[in-house]
Amino acid sequence: MEQGSETQPGPESRVLIIMTGGTICMRRSMNGFVPAQGFLETCMAPQRPFNDGSSPSDINVIIDDEGTEQPHRSYRTPISTYQKHVRYAVLEFKELLDSSSVNADGWTHIAQTIYRNYRLFDAFVILHGTDSLAYTCSALSFMLQNLGKPVILTGSQAPMLELQNDATPNLLGSLIIAGHFMIPEVCLFFNYSLMRGNRTTKVSATDFAAFASPNLPPLATISSLKTHVSWDLVYRSINLKAFSIQTSRATGNVAPLRIFPGIKPELVEAVLRLDGLKGLVLETFGAGNAPGGPDGALTRVFADAVKRGIVIVNVTQCMTGTVSPLYEPAMLLQRAGVVPGHDMTSEAALAKLSYLLALPNLTIEDVRQQMAISLRGELTAQTSVVFAHPGTANLTSLCYAISKGSEEEVQEILKGDIGWVVNEADYSGNTPLVGPILHIRMARKLLICGLNTG
């Protein structure tokens, strides 16, 4: 056994594999690949890595809300380098789905299956199609509350019955980690890497390295020698409440909107006026930037929607990096009431927003506040600004507002930048004192905010 590793006690752990469908269980047909039942006996039992040759035994699986127990055939893996077997059973959904058809009802079905069997198994592996896998990972990470056991989702780019496939290593790796390491998170295992589920996104339609975790390193990796777990990255709930699930979701009340060059305020307004819309994930340029539109018309559209109670969350279109008000466009969005989503993926932001909007005791302001903080490790909390350009954009705006004598604009700028911009200088050394201050009240306001006259 590895020094410093964390393994579950006992010679044999129990894992429930939940088969929802997807490429991993598909077989050839006259109409191409289709999901097929009988995965355990057809795909797993004949393979030595999944079957040590010992006599299979039945273990009970709860199949409905009434607590009905049904015996399922189980097999056992050969003994691992950690001197432990993993015994597993497969529960197949009656209707196997292509993951492009998975929706909130499918997520609820998965969550309920885990909840019913939570005390009977040490861990859970969910087999799922790859198209919507990152969405399901993010959704489950919020639906499964106070999780204390591993839940690992995986799938494949090629069916297990095909000669060249990634299904076998993906499933075996998931089973080994689930059965040996106490990583109490919703994770995604693919291509020998275990990633936090709500940090993942699909990056390839064909490659075996189909998923990435752009802003967080893998929680674990498997090599020919061992499984390496980065225990310092593992998220653990500090809440002592019992495991529960939240199945009410507002998925029909949230939407994503991708900013593009030349986007018209009228188009955005139409989206924000959709019947029943409560939340919007705004996919912006770079570090959270979006065009303001002619005379700030687009920014006003966002501000008006926020005033109507719509929660708008700003995430970047970039693969890596974070939303941060380094530039004026991002700062203007933040002043309009748009919530910075930091380095959340679009999938995680949508899942989190629909989860929070469905919680009965949260106000809109509560939802806004919780969207900006980490609940399940879905974003990196920034405690301080690591890097910032000199604030020339806001400084220029302030000087311009002062020169116009617009006290209202000056107050609006100082809302977000109070305490530093009044004493900032641009690359030429110009400060707010360079331009004429037209009103005594404005001068008094700047002095109250800390203007240095020395």
Residue map of PLM features:
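ATP/NTP phosphate-donor binding region
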Residues: M1-R116, N361
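Accessory alpha-helical/coil subdomains and C-terminal extensions
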Residues: P11-E12, I18, G22, L40-G67, ...
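Ankyrin-repeat inter-repeat connecting loop/turn
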Residues: V421-V422, T453
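ATP/nucleoside-binding phosphotransfer catalytic cores, i.e., glycine-rich phosphate-binding loops
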Residues: E2-Q3, P9-P11, E269, G292-T392
